[in-house]
Amino acid sequence: MGFGRRDRFFRGRGGLGRHRFGLGRGRNRRRRQGRLTTVGRLAVLVGGFACVGVVLGLKGGWVAWQSRDAARVPLPHVAAAPPLAGPPWVSLLTPPIGRERFEQARRRALEFDPTAAPRLVEWIDTAGHASAPAGGRESSDDRRVEYSLDERLTAEVFEILRKGRVESGHAIVLDPRSGRLLAYVSTNPEAFPPDRAYPAASIVKVLTAAALLEEKEGDAGIDCVYRGNKYRLNRRRLDPPSSGRRSGLEEALATSNNQCFSQWAVHELGEPTLRATLRRFGWLEPPVPGHEAGRIGEIQTRLDLGRLGSGLDGLRVTPLHVAALTSILTDGRSVEPWWVDRIVDGEGRSIELPARAEPRRVMDTVRADRLREMLVATTARGTARGAFRSKRGRPRLGSLSVAGKTGNLTGSDPFGRYEWFVGVAPAEDPRIGVVVLQLQGHLWWRKSSELAASIFEEVFCDRSGCRAEAANRWTGDLGPAVAPVRISDLGGPIRLSQLTSERAGSGSGRIHAKP
């Protein structure tokens, strides 16, 4: 009654009607809740594991896709022994870049001379290991190494990286005019060694731009047309489209335009010219003994060449390679970095080592000045603009300008996001060069450009403001010393057993090696 066809449907099922299905027995009766059988529970569990496996498989596929081209160049594991084993003097001259060894060298300097300039000092035994003077006195076999690294500046750089929560990273501060290192810091030198080559990322664009300036006799006619996302690259985007957005060389550098630099590498330069430029800049040789040489991956297609010229893949360099770039940006000459002021034997006599070689001309001064001028756009309105401005939008260095370049790329061995910054300041007349490289994981706190900006602040700024002359407190004379040691001059080891006085019994204190 009152149910019509629906009521007849229930009554036609064995005479049980609505009661068969539990209907009509009261509105407040609790409904039965479904329960999984043992088989059902196992099915759900297996399905859950399958979903997790799919997610992990997709992640692994993504990682493999990201590193597919990088896998062409086999790399030794970072925990392996350093390559290019050199003579004992090479290990002797390895600077105290880790925190623990830095603190030891700091204390040794105070023990040696509390009133001396704030540089780092170590005693090295005949095996090339740091040693503590027994009873406060040096052994006759020990050698005292006085580094050019400034103790106060190095401590400040360590603090900047600590505040930035940089777990694996390197920072170098140097005088680009002389190649003299003022600070050399590594937060995790065992797992992320500074002597290994890592993806160069968009820092390569600086060398590509230098090659374009050489080929085109200036940048007036260098421009490109691109479509879509300037950072995305594929085979179709290697050729200029019939219409799209236009960019010149300076803007492409400032915004790190991958499409433009890949087009220029393919259509304007070619592989031989690009390789020759990398070789001329010294990036295919070790920057100093004991460090890896830069390496170019195999170039088989136009896309490989485009990726090399834009920095998306194909080249690995060490932080010291990039540090040497600051000297070329300063006046077009390549000056090898160095960090030893002098070496003294156990009797207090300076060991005279080979004189430094003359700087090598890489590009003329006019083109170097123009390239440096274009790189100012990176910090003024490009990819590093936010790093060099305060939260209120004011320049962090006042009227001082910085010429620089950013770079970031996901790489392997170890896997992570490699983020670079290289810069010189003041851009008009560089006195300081800064290089920062950090390996970022899934969680990171500060960009390398932000860390570099803080380092520049420490160098140039005080309570009275920022000025170029403030750099003199770090780059000034450290006192009487022999001619600075150029690391590459130590191809043949000089042992104390081979040394004789210049004039026997003269007491001159100057030591020379036997021929």
Task: Label each PLM-derived region with a short phrase.
Residues R41-G47, G53-H170, P354-A357, A468-P493:
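Extracytoplasmic/periplasmic proteins that interact with beta-lactams or build/remodel peptidoglycan
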Residues P194-I203, P286-G348, R356:
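Active-site-proximal helix/loop microenvironment
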Residues K391-A427:
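Short, Gly/Ser/Thr-enriched beta-strand-loop segments that form substrate-interacting elements
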Residues M1-V39:
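N-terminal Lys/Arg-rich, disordered targeting/topogenic segments
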Residues S168-R177, L207, I222-N234, P240-R295, ...:
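Active-site-adjacent helix/loop patches that line small-molecule binding or acyl-intermediate pockets
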Residues E156-L161, G179, A197-C224, A252, ...:
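Active-site SXXK
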Residues D223-L253, P289-H291, A324-R392, D462-L490, ...:
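Conserved active-site-proximal loop/helix segments of enzymes involved in bacterial cell-wall
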Residues L161-P189:
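A short, well-structured edge-of-sheet supersecondary motif
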